[in-house]
Protein backbone atom coordinates (compact mmCIF):
# COMPACT_ATOMS: atom_id res chain seq x y z
CA UNK A 1 0.00 0.00 0.00
CA UNK A 2 1.20 3.49 -0.87
CA UNK A 3 0.34 6.93 0.44
CA UNK A 4 -0.73 9.94 -1.60
CA UNK A 5 -0.74 13.30 0.14
CA UNK A 6 -2.44 16.22 -1.57
CA UNK A 7 -0.50 19.38 -0.71
CA UNK A 8 -1.31 21.72 -3.56
CA UNK A 9 -3.90 24.02 -2.02
CA UNK A 10 -3.12 27.68 -1.43
CA UNK A 11 -4.88 28.16 1.91
CA UNK A 12 -6.95 31.23 1.11
CA UNK A 13 -9.08 30.73 4.25
CA UNK A 14 -5.91 30.92 6.38
CA UNK A 15 -4.77 34.29 5.09
CA UNK A 16 -2.83 36.30 6.10
CA UNK A 17 -0.82 33.38 7.55
CA UNK A 18 -0.51 31.70 4.14
CA UNK A 19 0.48 34.82 2.19
CA UNK A 20 4.11 33.88 2.75
CA UNK A 21 4.08 30.10 3.01
CA UNK A 22 2.40 26.79 2.34
CA UNK A 23 -0.73 26.09 4.37
CA UNK A 24 0.46 22.49 4.83
CA UNK A 25 3.45 23.84 6.76
CA UNK A 26 1.41 25.98 9.19
CA UNK A 27 2.41 24.70 12.63
CA UNK A 28 0.03 22.98 15.04
CA UNK A 29 1.69 22.52 18.45
CA UNK A 30 5.01 23.63 16.89
CA UNK A 31 4.86 20.96 14.16
CA UNK A 32 3.85 21.60 10.54
CA UNK A 33 0.44 20.02 9.97
CA UNK A 34 1.79 18.07 6.98
CA UNK A 35 4.27 16.29 9.26
CA UNK A 36 1.41 14.73 11.23
CA UNK A 37 0.06 13.17 8.03
CA UNK A 38 3.48 11.81 7.13
CA UNK A 39 3.84 10.30 10.61
CA UNK A 40 0.35 8.79 10.43
CA UNK A 41 1.18 7.09 7.12
CA UNK A 42 4.45 5.76 8.56
CA UNK A 43 2.66 4.53 11.70
CA UNK A 44 0.23 2.61 9.45
CA UNK A 45 3.13 0.75 7.84
CA UNK A 46 3.15 2.73 4.60
CA UNK A 47 6.65 3.43 3.28
CA UNK A 48 6.20 4.92 -0.21
CA UNK A 49 4.49 8.30 -0.29
CA UNK A 50 3.75 10.63 -3.18
CA UNK A 51 3.13 14.28 -2.40
CA UNK A 52 1.13 16.24 -4.97
CA UNK A 53 2.31 19.85 -4.81
CA UNK A 54 1.28 23.14 -6.32
CA UNK A 55 2.82 26.61 -6.20
CA UNK A 56 4.53 25.96 -2.86
CA UNK A 57 6.14 22.70 -3.99
CA UNK A 58 9.72 23.84 -3.43
CA UNK A 59 8.91 25.00 0.10
CA UNK A 60 7.26 21.66 0.89
CA UNK A 61 10.16 19.73 -0.65
CA UNK A 62 12.60 21.77 1.45
CA UNK A 63 10.70 20.99 4.66
CA UNK A 64 10.00 17.29 4.02
CA UNK A 65 13.12 16.29 2.10
CA UNK A 66 13.34 12.64 1.11
CA UNK A 67 11.06 11.51 3.96
CA UNK A 68 13.75 9.50 5.72
CA UNK A 69 13.10 11.13 9.12
CA UNK A 70 9.76 9.25 9.10
CA UNK A 71 11.16 6.10 7.50
CA UNK A 72 9.46 7.03 4.22
CA UNK A 73 10.49 7.29 0.59
CA UNK A 74 8.89 10.47 -0.77
CA UNK A 75 8.20 11.22 -4.43
CA UNK A 76 7.07 14.71 -5.43
CA UNK A 77 4.33 15.05 -8.03
CA UNK A 78 3.83 18.62 -9.29
CA UNK A 79 0.31 19.72 -10.18
CA UNK A 80 0.37 22.76 -12.48
CA UNK A 81 -3.14 23.94 -11.58
CA UNK A 82 -5.57 23.07 -8.76
CA UNK A 83 -7.99 20.92 -10.73
CA UNK A 84 -9.39 18.80 -7.91
CA UNK A 85 -8.84 15.54 -6.07
CA UNK A 86 -9.46 13.27 -9.05
CA UNK A 87 -6.94 15.21 -11.12
CA UNK A 88 -4.36 14.76 -8.36
CA UNK A 89 -4.91 10.99 -8.49
CA UNK A 90 -4.59 11.12 -12.29
CA UNK A 91 -1.23 12.90 -11.94
CA UNK A 92 -0.12 10.19 -9.50
CA UNK A 93 -1.21 7.18 -11.58
CA UNK A 94 2.33 6.19 -12.62
CA UNK A 95 3.53 6.48 -9.01
CA UNK A 96 0.56 4.50 -7.65
CA UNK A 97 0.52 1.80 -10.31
CA UNK A 98 -1.98 -0.93 -9.43
CA UNK A 99 -1.41 -0.72 -5.68
CA UNK A 100 -3.94 0.16 -3.02
CA UNK A 101 -3.31 3.62 -1.61
CA UNK A 102 -4.32 6.01 1.12
CA UNK A 103 -5.15 9.52 -0.06
CA UNK A 104 -4.49 11.99 2.74
CA UNK A 105 -5.22 15.70 2.52
CA UNK A 106 -2.05 17.51 3.56
CA UNK A 107 -3.86 20.12 5.62
CA UNK A 108 -5.91 17.62 7.66
CA UNK A 109 -5.18 16.43 11.15
CA UNK A 110 -6.67 13.19 12.43
CA UNK A 111 -6.31 13.02 16.19
CA UNK A 112 -5.87 9.24 16.38
CA UNK A 113 -4.03 8.71 13.10
CA UNK A 114 -5.07 6.31 10.36
CA UNK A 115 -3.66 2.94 11.42
CA UNK A 116 -7.03 1.56 12.55
CA UNK A 117 -8.66 2.66 9.27
CA UNK A 118 -5.90 1.09 7.15
CA UNK A 119 -6.11 -2.13 9.16
CA UNK A 120 -9.91 -2.19 8.79
CA UNK A 121 -9.67 -1.65 5.03
CA UNK A 122 -7.11 -4.43 4.65
CA UNK A 123 -9.24 -6.81 6.73
CA UNK A 124 -12.39 -6.07 4.72
CA UNK A 125 -10.49 -6.37 1.45
CA UNK A 126 -9.11 -9.76 2.47
CA UNK A 127 -12.46 -11.04 3.76
CA UNK A 128 -14.52 -9.77 0.82
CA UNK A 129 -12.05 -10.42 -1.95
CA UNK A 130 -10.16 -7.78 -3.89
CA UNK A 131 -13.02 -6.91 -6.21
CA UNK A 132 -15.65 -6.33 -3.53
CA UNK A 133 -13.93 -3.88 -1.20
CA UNK A 134 -12.17 -1.26 -3.26
CA UNK A 135 -12.60 1.98 -1.33
CA UNK A 136 -13.07 3.42 2.12
CA UNK A 137 -13.91 7.09 2.63
CA UNK A 138 -13.49 8.97 5.91
CA UNK A 139 -15.81 11.91 6.43
CA UNK A 140 -16.50 14.13 9.42
CA UNK A 141 -19.58 16.18 10.19
CA UNK A 142 -19.01 19.94 10.33
CA UNK A 143 -21.48 22.72 11.16
CA UNK A 144 -21.11 24.46 7.78
CA UNK A 145 -20.16 21.85 5.15
CA UNK A 146 -20.68 24.24 2.22
CA UNK A 147 -17.45 25.98 3.23
CA UNK A 148 -15.48 22.75 2.80
CA UNK A 149 -17.31 20.72 0.18
CA UNK A 150 -20.15 18.26 0.50
CA UNK A 151 -19.55 14.58 -0.21
CA UNK A 152 -22.09 12.87 -2.44
CA UNK A 153 -21.98 9.10 -2.69
Where are these regions (language model features)?
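A structure-centric signal for secondary-structure junctions around beta-strands
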Residues: 1, 22, 132-133, 147-148
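Conserved N-terminal catalytic core of the sugar/cofactor nucleotidyltransferase
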Residues: 2-5, 13-16, 26-27, 31-105, ...
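Active-site glycine-centered loops adjacent to acidic/histidine catalytic or metal-binding residues
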Residues: 9, 107, 141
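A generic "binding-loop/recognition-motif" signal
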Residues: 10, 21, 56
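Short beta-strand-to-loop element that shapes/binds the nucleotide-sugar donor at the catalytic cleft/hinge
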Residues: 134-153
Amino acid sequence: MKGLILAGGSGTRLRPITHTGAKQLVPVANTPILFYGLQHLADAGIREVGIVTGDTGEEIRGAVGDGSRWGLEVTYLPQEAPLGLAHAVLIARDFLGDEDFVMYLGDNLLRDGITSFVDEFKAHRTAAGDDLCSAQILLAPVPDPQRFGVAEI
